[in-house]
Amino acid sequence: MESKEHKGLSRRALFSATAGSAILAGTVGPAALSLGAAGLATPARAATGADGSVAPGKLDDYYGFWSSGQTGEMRILGIPSMRELMRVPVFNRCSATGWGQTNESIRIHQRTMTEKTKKQLAANGKKIHDNGDLHHVHMSFTDGKYDGRYLFMNDKANTRVARVRCDVMKTDAILEIPNAKGIHGMRPQKWPRSNYVFCNGEDEAPLVNDGSTMTDVATYVNIFTAVDADKWEVAWQVKVSGNLDNCDADYEGKWAFSTSYNSEMGMTLEEMTKSEMDHVVVFNIAEIEKAIKAGQYEEINGVKVVDGRKEAKSLFTRYIPIANNPHGCNMAPDRKHLCVAGKLSPTVTVLDVTKFDALFYDNAEPRSAVVAEPELGLGPLHTAFDGRGNAYTSLFLDSQVVKWNIDEAIRAYAGEKINPIKDKLDVQYQPGHLKTVMGETLDAANDWLVCLCKFSKDRFLNVGPLKPENDQLIDISGDKMVLVHDGPTFAEPHDAIAVSPSILPNIRSVWDRKDPLWAETRKQAEADEVDIDEWTEAVIRDGNKVRVYMTSVAPSFSQPSFTVKEGDEVTVIVTNLDEIDDLTHGFTMGNHGVAMEVGPQQTSSVTFVAANPGVYWYYCQWFCHALHMEMRGRMFVEPKGA
């Protein structure tokens, strides 16, 4: 392997640096202080160009689907206006909609929950997690292009992934992934369609995590997971060497790839940054599928697992050395090149995926797949692409976005005297993910780039110690990038995608009465001989369990009142029979911590205990009618023994 001087940050620099201060001379490698490739383009001050505004009553050109990090929800924005259009609760408990409290949402949370998780939650008085750390949102693909069926997202906090239906923009499935810990990187298969969603386990732990070997790091392992995107269950898993960070997939359906910043399997920051080189893991999908089909796997916690660690010398994986603590892993729309950001190295490594067959079947030297390694600046994290062969990489430490040309970087790596860097733009501040419109598909556009900055500092009015993030809109239609908008966002978007509305023609404004979301609720109603598709006001008592069926048509509930006994478990089932767009109802039970959304033609239900005797008003918390305030009724709770 070619020997190259390591030009990243020293370990001392890493420990002494803070995100809020620049890393100056003496704390960076010599490349950053020389007139190397990274220094040839003069950074431009962020300038104001076309403002990207959308007039009242006009629609945005694109949907933006945002993660929210520790808030646990998905957000929908309009691009270029950057107006927030909707929040879709996923892993979080949502007070507005009742997500995480309605019976329908609890079933989705619990469907794949492990017994260990149920035990942990029960010990803390819970049925489900009420938090999540949602980093990445990606859409399903067909033939390398978005197909508008599903959106997928991860939960790093509780080792889960979720699926949102694009026709109603509601979560329809959550999967807890066994054996792995801390699902971070997550990408759908691009070709021929998203049969799989690939998920990276970031955190190291024993596979048999029962406390018997918890101090023996030699028993720790990381897991790469393929989730069946249609069945929403684990298809197979691969043991790997090192940990897993971000991932992506190719445009032929042959490969998936993941970065690893902890090839050392270190347990401390110093140990994790010790090596000059880490790696990218390449997964051979066909070989893994062949082994699974032939029964050549071990079953661990009900999952089929193959061994792709280095010492296994299998055809499942190959490891390509990359400097240093690599992070972003982004496949270009040219179908050929994978860009891996160095994070602690000022470089992005460009891999030619057409050379991967030789790594597996011809014993080619791992770095033979490297075709470019441009020096771009300090702290490269992620790369986005336009449709003209250009790449855009975020530089966390430099607080910049750098535009560079992939073909010219390859020519420079081969020895040609050419500078692939086309432009640099200051952003505010410390950028992480960035995305062009449709840039992770074969339909990459050339108009807008969104850069998600981790710090806003002085860009907005001071709102206290916790500041908003800053999502910046950048015009990339010309030769130079132009900053056109600052967008404050609540904690903490990590990633986003931008999608043409033409891909989403089937978004509904009114629910289908046969929707599977409330199928189990309908089954219970049928057992109770209640028709929830018609006006109903039934009350069913089953011991100390009471089911109250009611219909809502603005501005009234079919049940002006109902009576239960102290200590009863009460389930209220509400069906909104209005068929008008945007006529959402709600049901809130006063002084019981109960509230839920009931969209037009939707059925929703919620269960609670009526613990105290007395009169309690329920009401519609959505403003659905001029007589909205009058849309209410009483629950009478009779004292025990009355």
Swiss-Prot record:
Keywords from the named record: Calcium, Copper, Metal-binding, Oxidoreductase, Periplasm, Signal
Residues that hold Cu cation A1 according to the record: 585, 620, 624, 631
Catalytic activity: N2 + 2 Fe(III)-[cytochrome c] + H2O = nitrous oxide + 2 Fe(II)-[cytochrome c] + 2 H(+)
Post-translation changes: Predicted to be exported by the Tat system. The position of the signal peptide cleavage has been experimentally proven.
EC number(s) from the headed UniProt entry: 1.7.2.4
Metal-binding keyword on record: yes
Cofactor field: Ca(2+); Cu cation
Positions annotated to bind Ca(2+) 2: 261, 264, 272, 278, 325
Top enzyme category: oxidoreductase
Any one of the GO CC terms: periplasmic space
Entry's Gene Ontology BP terms: denitrification pathway
Major localization listed first in the record, in broad terms: periplasm
Localization per Swiss-Prot or TrEMBL: Periplasm
Single GO MF descriptor: copper ion binding
Binding, Cu cation Z4: 494
Residues annotated to bind Cu cation Z1: 327, 382
Pathway(s) where this gene product acts: Nitrogen metabolism; nitrate reduction (denitrification); dinitrogen from nitrate: step 4/4
Function: Nitrous-oxide reductase is part of a bacterial respiratory system which is activated under anaerobic conditions in the presence of nitrate or nitrous oxide.
HAMAP family named among the record's database cross-references: NosZ
UniProt name for this protein: Nitrous-oxide reductase
Gene source species: Achromobacter cycloclastes
Lineage of the organism: Bacteria, Pseudomonadati, Pseudomonadota, Betaproteobacteria, Burkholderiales
Gene responsible for this protein: nosZ
